[in-house]
Amino acid sequence: MEPQDPVKREGRLTPVIVLATLIAAFGSSFQYGYNVAAINSPSEFMKDFYNYTYYDRVGEYMNEFYLTLLWSVTVSMFPFGGFLGSLMVGPLVNNLGRKGTLLFNNIFSIVPALLMGFSELAKSFEMIIVARVLVGICAGLSSNVVPMYLGELAPKNWRGALGVVPQLFITIGILVAQIFGLRSLLANEEGWPILLGLTGIPAVLQLLFLPFFPESPRYLLIQKKDEAAAKSALRRLRGWHDVDAEIEEILEEDRAEKAVGFISVLKLFKMRSLRWQVISIIVLMAGQQLSGVNAIYYYADQIYLSAGVNEDDVQYVTAGTGAVNVLITVCAIFVVELMGRRFLLLLGFSVCFTACCVLTGALALQDVISWMPYVSIACVISYVIGHALGPSPIPALLVTEIFLQSSRPAAYMVAGTVHWLSNFTVGLVFPFIQVGLGAYSFVIFAVICLLTTVYIFLIIPETKSKTFIEINRIFIKMNKVPGVHPEKEELKEFPPSTARQ
């Protein structure tokens, strides 16, 4: 019988897992990517709307400073909302579950979609600003909860591949927004409210279909203490009846952590047994955002123009870059279980480091050497490829893998906070760096890529095809502690967690 064959059972991707992955990623991660890019193409039309609306109210147009400030607020509200969403992860996933949080999160997509879609009709740019905060909260929650949910659904030998799927849908969301954002489609005076309002469609589809799929078995067994529901979920996910071995592995994790209860962010920073895990997610998440990925996209249009690309055609080249991003992320899904997480991180950050160094030289010399702009384009594409291989998809996957059930929600809160604050910082600071350093702006990002690469080489272990307990044992040795959570006496000073109730 098939259930007696451990190889088949270990490697099986069932329709339930595949569909749950696609619905969770499309309904949540896709929106993150879509809202990152959707606001770029119609920006001039939206600024005109801001100005005309202001004129209708007070009888005069905004001055340049006030318009720029208002637009900067509009753009920056998205990462600010992402930061707020990250702070909500722990309480929501512990009380509503992983699937329940994703369903609840659709509120933060449908409401802002309506606000943005009807903002022109209502003659209110304030509706757009509020909506950007709300879709930011949606992105902050989804960027943490989707990897957690999929990581807990997946069998260990598919955890890496499924863990990359959220990043794939982020890149697809960016590409779809770039395509819809072509001037011939929706990036025009009539179409921009529709472009912004389309973000609600994936949320509606997720609300309709995700309830038919299982909650995380780990959440059901460890936090809800419902073994029958956990077994039922596992049977649907694995496609066979005998799930006792996996139930026992989850219970082993539960027994190892039972003495400390569920861990808050404050506890997370206090515990010696989690020291290197916490440092690692901070370094990886900061490295992911501070390595210059947003700056590369910010600078790309100027690089394409300097290489002689017609101004009207830059939008198509940008969409082509987005397509490369999607293609390489698809490749990452297939190679992450072959090459491992550590290798892809090292390769990705190394490629980004090299691309930043060469790009600096190319930008400095493009007025002297005629073919240097083409080198700059090659550097942009190389950087996008490198980032899509490792720095973009792997850090969120590792947060799921290097923390056990009790500390995972708090770890995602820390990781998400670092991610969004770093994102916000780059968006705020890079324009000033660009003015001050010009072509040499990317030296800073090259240094960050190099330092992150060195840290990964020295510290980050390979987690491929290991159970959560096996990964934790690696960190027990690194943290030089005798067990999973030896500091039980230290933790008595903290108030008990209510997450298990």
From Swiss-Prot:
Residues at which D-fructose binds: 32, 167, 288, 296-298, 387, 419-420
Gene3D superfamilies cross-referenced by the UniProt entry: MFS general substrate transporter like domains (1.20.1250.20)
Primary residence: membrane
Subcellular location per the Swiss-Prot or TrEMBL entry: Apical cell membrane; Cell membrane; Cell membrane, Sarcolemma
Residues bearing glycans: 51
GO biological process: cellular response to fructose stimulus; D-glucose import; dehydroascorbic acid transport; fructose import across plasma membrane; fructose transmembrane transport; regulation of systemic arterial blood pressure mediated by a chemical signal; response to fructose
Catalytic activity entry: D-fructose(out) = D-fructose(in)
Modified residue annotations for N-acetylmethionine: 1
Matches recorded under Pfam families: Sugar_tr
InterPro entries: Fru_transpt_5 (IPR002442), GLUT (IPR045263), MFS_dom (IPR020846), MFS_sugar_transport-like (IPR005828), MFS_trans_sf (IPR036259), Sugar/inositol_transpt (IPR003663), Sugar_transporter_CS (IPR005829)
Membrane topology designation: Multi-pass membrane protein
One Gene Ontology MF term: fructose transmembrane transporter activity
Extracellular-side segments: 40-68, 120-126, 183-192, 299-313, 364-371, 434-439
Role played: Functions as a fructose transporter that has only low activity with other monosaccharides. Can mediate the uptake of deoxyglucose, but with low efficiency. Essential for fructose uptake in the small intestine. Plays a role in the regulation of salt uptake and blood pressure in response to dietary fructose. Required for the development of high blood pressure in response to high dietary fructose intake.
Family: Belongs to the major facilitator superfamily. Sugar transporter (TC 2.A.1.1) family. Glucose transporter subfamily.
Protein's recorded name: Solute carrier family 2, facilitated glucose transporter member 5
Organism: Bos taurus (Bovine)
